[in-house]
Amino acid sequence: MTNNNLLAQLNDNLDFISRHNGPDRTQQQHMLDTLKVDSIEQMIDKTVPDNIRLLQPMALAKPQSEIEMLATLKGIASKNKVNRSYIGQGYYDTHVPHVILRNVFENPGWYTAYTPYQPEISQGRLEALLNFQQMITDLTAMELSNASLLDEATAAAEAMSLCKRASKNKSNVFFVSDDVHPQTLDVINTRAKYFSFEVVVAPCSELENHDVFGALLQYPGTTGQVHNLEKIIEQAHSKKTLVAVAADLLALTVLKAPGEMGADVVIGSAQRFGVPMGYGGPHAAFMATKEKYKRTIPGRVIGVSIDSKGKPALRMAMQTREQHIRREKANSNICTAQALLANMASFYAVYHGPQGLRKMGRRVNRLTSVLAAGLQKAGIELVHNDFFDTITLQTNEKTDAIYQRALAADLNLRLLPDQLGISLDETTTSADVEALWLAITEQSFNVDDIEQTLSAEFCNIPADCQRTSEYLSHPVFNSYHSETRMLRYLKSLENKDFSLTHGMIPLGSCTMKLNATAQMIPVTWPEFSRMHPFAPSDQCTGYETLAESFSDMLIEITGYDAFSLQPNSGAQGEYAGLIAIQRYHASRGEDYRNICLIPSSAHGTNPASASMVSMRIVLVNCDKEGNVDLDDLKEKINLHRDQLSAMMITYPSTHGVYEESIKEICELIHEAGGQVYLDGANMNAQVGLTSPGFIGADVSHLNLHKTFCIPHGGGGPGMGPIGVKSHLADFLPGHSVTNTVGAVSATALGSASILPISWAYIALMGAEGLKSATELAILNANYIMEKLSPHYPILFRGKQGRVAHECIIDLRPLKESSGISEEDVAKRLMDFGFHAPTMSFPVAGTLMIEPTESESLEELDKFIDALITIRHEIAKVEEGTWTLADNPLVNAPHTLNDLTGSDWPRAYSRLTACYPSSCPSQPKFWPTTNRIDNVYGDRNLICSCPPIESYQSTDT
């Protein structure tokens, strides 16, 4: 370092890169020495095929410091104009209770956890999600709810699919009320097209005139009207038609529940229960239904079971009915949820309680009645006189003038043909109502004076629509209304869950890397969080700038030509990408191309997504090294050449290796007229070294919650934007807001408010930083592989003996020799303070390990030592020192009660059970329950909150 360029070197802004990447230079060299290579470059040369290596570095802006990045992003955010939005249409301003904002939404203990597939270390969020299900079933008066879906429009499309599967009416027509939200109709039309359903849109009163397998009604309607649906539903049932109702949760605090009117399915959004609008998301949608449809409901369902000691414990129930597991037989590809947002909504209900929520609903309705009365006094005509929180004004030729006056007063109304819509919400005040009167009528009124003219409460809700039944009577919704008690309840749940705040989560194919604090901060900025997704475009310049900038970044990283940011999950990205392929073929007069080739090792969402666009799935074999069998591929191509639509393939492969023949595979598909869908789940092993576009793929989705640092949230949110080559750009998802078709999500930018996280990651890392992250992810995985290979068989390796960013250890031989299963090893790792790797995917009886670039050598070594110790424990079972029925593996995990209880009937010590690799003085994460009985939970299905006696005290 010379004095001539000292300042430039001190200002290099590379600090964040070293903070994101786990191993420092010294640790990297130690790992390289273990691998017997001289440098990272040499290791990459031995791992990544030369013919797919990028010829030049990515052309991204130089890395910014955290301070610079936040300043840049603040400048972008400031371009958004945050008006008072009364647009409604399923999106409402809300007050996020500060105790939830700080202790859940902004808390890495909640947002860095993974989906609770390991329930013994997930009891906290499982309880919160069970509360969510109880909240939904109570408010809707249904019997069963799932633990959230991606958005309300997606939930409506899923409801249509459920109706088709469960209905005894053989029609192929689905009825949609003309008063549903337009974005919901968009997504239904897309889904229906590829299921070959006909969609009829008409007033709900005309449902009896149609022979349909199912119907969707909105309650209240998108224009605000409230009317009793009981007779309409009864008439539909007489024709064996199933009826789904899209309902508003806050409205259900004062309106008669859809379940009380006979609904078969109820869907909607929990957004207004304390989750910011965020320009469209992320939000937790919901679906509730009848008990008899429990095997048909999509998404995750939390259930009550027991552990090995017979104590109540929670788990995800009926996992074998999840659609991604059903593969090509699926009607849905749902494999994620919106857990973080569902938890926030459930905590909102816990904090406010039934009385607080009902008071809120009463207040919103009263303000709406006062607003309507003042407008009528000024001569404004209402389209409907029965409403909850939304009124529609018949303004005719005055529509534009009134709309513009409102805009001039920084008020957003909903613009309809010759009409204006106004939706009030929790945040609306009396002053807001008076401002609306002034803008709309140019007259001043006083709220108190107008209220005096009203009759009894609920004067604008028909008597047969007023709720009389109780809800949220479980003690959990009636106990935590002081901030002190709520804070302790939240903390008690958080303390039960393992997250990245505790240690490595080495889940293969999940990329549980650092979610840096600086990247998370902008999510709660009001310039991002309070934007309505259907606000006028000139108010949304900040989001448009962010989306364009982020898309440009992804284009450079992937080698594609265009991006859509609309899909709300990786599976939804797959669906959108396959639709783009099918629309492309149709545009060329080749809509007969409907064969999708999929390797036998593929994730279950691949065949599920292909099934959803009516593709016929043909499986391609893999060889003993885990690669696509080229001979079998060529045979399948020749057999289906004229009908070949696409091939779906993951790269690096699902088996964790860089297939040498990937370019040849792409060429073979293209020669036969097909398109290549490259699943971006493993993009963390590509960035900066290769790219889907360079390899030869046509379309990919990217999991922003994997490679690009959006946190997993304990089971969502996620995002799955899709990139395409130029010939597919015209077939990306559209939206009615832009007068285009093909929507897969409710809003054009999907879960827009979490885009700043991934934008910030790329801005902080720059091209070299992103490349180094990829290299270190590969280094960490190969180091684990090298250290474990003397103890466990490594199932798949590349041509030169290397793995990509993950490795698979094969436990099948050990199960044969000892009886110890992969589940036993996974549960035993909890006793060492680790989350288990991915179990039995992509091969049954294995564990797939992905350390990511963010873990240090110290953490890797502790994990390796744990697995080596476990191997020695297995040897004791093999040798007969421990019996198969009584050893620390089959009895794992062990709890604090095991350590301190009076009874210990085991052949091994408590110290061996609870502190297998550390002394008792060291910190340890404790599972809060013993191993959970999955079979019992499915045979005795309970998906609502158990009696309060089953809960331990959360105040002690």
Swiss-Prot record:
Keyword Oxidoreductase assigned: yes
Domain of life, source organism: Bacteria
GO BP term, example: glycine decarboxylation via glycine cleavage system
Residue pairs linked by disulfide bridges in the UniProt entry: none
Keywords: Oxidoreductase, Pyridoxal phosphate
A GO-annotated cellular component: cytosol
An MF annotation (GO) of this entry: glycine binding
CDD domains hit by this protein: GDC-P
Primary enzyme class: oxidoreductase
Named cofactor requirement(s): pyridoxal 5'-phosphate
Positions carrying N6-(pyridoxal phosphate)lysine: K706
Role, per record: The glycine cleavage system catalyzes the degradation of glycine. The P protein binds the alpha-amino group of glycine through its pyridoxal phosphate cofactor; CO(2) is released and the remaining methylamine moiety is then transferred to the lipoamide cofactor of the H protein.
HAMAP family (UniProt xref): GcvP (MF_00711)
Quaternary context: The glycine cleavage system is composed of four proteins: P, T, L and H.
Family: Belongs to the GcvP family.
Protein name: Glycine dehydrogenase (decarboxylating) 2
